[in-house]
A protein has these predicted regions:
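Short, contiguous acidic/charged loop-to-helix segments that flank catalytic cores in large enzymes
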Residues: 23-30, 55-59, 86-96, 133-136
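Active-site metal-binding core of divalent-cation-utilizing nuclease and nuclease-like domains
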Residues: 50-74
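Acidic-basic catalytic patches of nuclease active cores, encompassing PD-(D/E)XK
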Residues: 14-54
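Catalytic cores of nucleic-acid endonucleases
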Residues: 84-129
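Conserved catalytic cores of phosphodiester-cleaving nucleases, focusing on short active-site segments
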Residues: 67-69, 78-86
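Feature representing long, continuous alpha-helical segments
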Residues: 33, 37, 41, 77, ...
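Domain-level recognition of nuclease-like catalytic cores that cleave nucleotide substrates
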Residues: 120-171
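Intrinsically disordered, low-complexity, repeat-rich regions
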Residues: 1-17
Length: 171
């Protein structure tokens, strides 16, 4: 499921490169619920009967995952935690999302061993580095998030996979 998840996130990037891309329309979305719907619709469109797509599925501890891909061929699942990069979230909040939401809450199920933090970015912005307190841009934030995901994945051991994907909606 992890390979399929990563492929589908890459497909979103490819979609944004087409001349009939929804990039400009998606960049105008400032509500996470609406963004979740358009991304889920696109993931559903490209499913090819390999998986089903659920939105806001409630987990055993009453937490809601943003998007869940369920394999049509096995019990395996992958979860996507969506965050709008232009919202007022700090770099620390985004880093904490990996462990606090994605790993502990959404990937706790036995058959859910693949997860992604999907961060959209509609315009340039900066975040305060969580340790050094200096301002950083999207590329450095992405590096910090990937490193955090790698650490979380190592702690969980083999068979659990986490990625971070930046969906760049900037003009």
């Amino acid at each position: 499921m992890f390979a399929l998840l990563k492929d589908r996130l890459s497909d979103l990037d490819d979609l944004l490169l087409h001349d009939d891309s929804p990039k400009e329309a998606w960049a105008l979305i400032s509500d996470e619920k609406i963004m979740r719907r358009v991304i889920a619709r696109e993931l559903r469109r490209t499913a090819n009967s390999l998986y089903t797509v659920d939105q806001e599925v409630v987990t055993a501890d009453e937490k809601e995952t943003d998007i869940r891909l369920r394999s049509a061929l096995s019990k395996h699942e992958a979860v996507i935690e969506l965050k709008l990069g232009n919202a007022k979230r700090s770099a620390k909040e985004l880093l904490d999302t990996i462990e606090g939401q994605l790993v502990r809450k959404y990937m706790a199920a036995e058959h859910c061993k693949a997860g992604a933090l999907l961060l959209t970015l509609a315009e340039d912005r900066q975040w305060q580095h969580p340790v050094e307190k200096r301002l950083i841009k999207a590329d450095e934030l992405l590096s910090l998030l990937i490193a955090q995901a790698d650490r979380a994945q190592q702690v969980l051991g083999g068979g659990t996979y986490i990625c971070v994907h930046l969906l760049d909606l900037r003009q």
